[in-house]
Amino acid sequence: GDVYKRQKQQEGDTVNRIDLTQAEWQLMEKLWDHAPQTGRELTEAMAAQTGWNRSTTLTLLRRLMEKGAVRCDAQGRKNVFYPAVRREDAAAQQTRDLLGRVYKGSLSMLVSEMTKREALPQREIDELHALLQEMEERKHHD
């Protein structure tokens, strides 16, 4: 996960593309769940959760700020960190990337692969069915 940002046209909107490594995701999850947090709060929480030392967490925070995923405000002598991207937006981007990279953009291939290996609970089957019906109805109204 090298640092890179590019402008991307997505359904008519220009969005900043932010690629996150697995470690950066862990730190972002902590911020999405509890924001804002001080540098000390984050380094202590990540040490307890992952065993990372202080400099590892601070390096990840710096990289996340460079990528535009995290904002930092100075409050007195403390730095306070906030997520600058919504979890939903980051997850949607990662999902589109996976779909394009692994399944050539085919959602049906992804669903097929995921359901071949293990049985889906009836609740999830019902949710997928409802989503497909909703998409079909929207298609006929457009």
Feature names for model-found ranges:
Residues G68:
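Glycine-centered, phosphate/nucleic-acid-interacting loop/turn motifs that mediate DNA/RNA or nucleotide
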Residues Q37-A45:
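Short acidic, hydrophobic short linear motifs in intrinsically disordered regions
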Residues G1-Y4:
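Short, small-residue-biased leader/transition segments that mark boundaries at the very start
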Residues R6-K30, K104:
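Short alpha-helical segments that sit at the start of domains
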Residues E44-N53:
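Short helix-coil junctions and helix-kink-helix linkers
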Residues R6-T14, K116-D142:
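C-terminal regulatory/oligomerization modules of transcriptional regulators
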Residues R17-A23, Q75-Q93:
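Short, cationic-aromatic polyanion-contact patches
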Residues V85-V111:
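Conserved segment of winged-helix/HTH DNA-binding domains
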